[in-house]
Amino acid sequence: MPDVEFRYLLLGCLAIALLVAAFTDIRRRQIDNWLNAAIAATAPLFWWASGLALWPDVAWQLGVAAITFAALAVLFAIRAMGGGDVKLLTALALWIQPVWFMRLLVVMALIGGVLTLVLGAWHVARRQRSKLAIPYGVAISAAGLWVLASQYLPAIQSPAAQAGIG
């Protein structure tokens, strides 16, 4: 049986964890393993509080997380993405329904593109010769927070989403 209050408590904790991930990525260009592990480890509590069935709901979550990790591990191997970013997105895949996770990826790519352009321009304007490091955890966290707000805060959902259409 779903436990709405506990689910919202967990979502609040996830939101705080995403803010911490963004902050540490800006500050140190690193997302701590303990934070990613905590996000992943609390996903089963969220499944329980949401009333997800093991089959097919939890199976879908695990499948999307496995595919996410496999795809992003390739990006990590070619040094296109940091390890913390890979683990953060994989952990988020355990929390977010597959349809919403696809939306997260689109929003993340858009935010990441803007972030790259802004930081790239700043890098050029300051005439820095060092390699530009993009704190992609910011884009991941912002997209994750957008999904949480869009999916779980009825006050800001569209009428179609409230009716179960969106």
Protein language model annotation of sequence segments:
Residues 1-166:
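A membrane-topology feature that recognizes alpha-helical transmembrane segments
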